[in-house]
Amino acid sequence: MYEEISSLANPRVRRVLQLQQKARTRKKENCFIIEGIRLFLDTPDDFLEEIFITADLLEREEARIREKITRHGCRIVTPEVMKKMSDTMTPQGVLCLASMPRYSMEDLLTGCPLLLLLENIQDPGNLGTMFRTAEAAGAAGILMNKGTADLFNPKTVRSTMSAVFRVPFLVTEDFSAALTQLRGRGLRIFAAHLAGQDNYDRADYTGPCGILIGNEGRGLTEEAAALATDLIRIPMHGRIESLNAAMAAGILMYEADRQRRQADR
């Protein structure tokens, strides 16, 4: 039999709310929230800690959900409790706690790495989109400074579409030192910058390299830009001065992927 939770004052409900609302709690407990059917099904079993599901979903949903719950167990919650715990307007009926993946710099530097290097990205949706795009474009990993948005913010997690479990990442306290370390390991660092003299499609991304993207409004800091080996730009027509950070990252990563696929032929 599964435990049933019907009280909004239940300690487990209060814990979920703390994890939803406070990055400090997530960091302290090394735990974050996964919400929705697809994200739940995509979460590797090794990371699942606790599952909450409504009775209605458990009764009507597909076999894969039942199989996962059979392996891990769950707690049945009322629709009112699920709505209280949920970060979305229309809860899908399943929410779980997952442990945070942990990586080292060496995990990012496998083979001939293509890395995405992020400085002070603030929008959770942008960060999540960058993770999805990095996975799709074959990036080896993502390095972020501590000023970048919380990866485990519920909105960011949803935006990654589970790429948070598949793309190695590292948050560094000293971004400049990390960039210097990457250069010392032989990586070229291409910075998307308005001062770039060369168009992005003239650069050679076939060797070990990183693509450096700065804050949505302010761009890269002078310190980070100075550590790039190459300043590149994306040419734009009309009166547009800049692109969305996630879009710029996608353009550059896919150009790198195109060149690498062509070089392998």
Predicted regions and their residues:
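Boundary-proximal intrinsically disordered activation/regulatory segments immediately upstream
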Residues: 1-62, 148-149
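Short acidic-hydrophobic, aromatic-tinged amphipathic segments that line or gate anion-handling sites
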Residues: 4-7, 75-78, 168-175
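Short, aromatic/basic amphipathic alpha-helical patches
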Residues: 60-71
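Glycine/small-residue-rich loop that forms an oxyanion/phosphate-binding "nest" at active or ligand-binding sites
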Residues: 69-97
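Short beta->alpha connector loops at strand-helix junctions that form conserved
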Residues: 77-78, 119, 145-146, 168, ...
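Structured adenosyl-cofactor binding patch, chiefly the S-adenosyl-L-methionine
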Residues: 98, 133-137, 151, 156-164, ...
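RNA substrate-binding interface of SAM-dependent RNA methyltransferases
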Residues: 103, 108-196
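Active-site/ligand-binding-proximal alpha/beta "capping" segment
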Residues: 190-240, 244
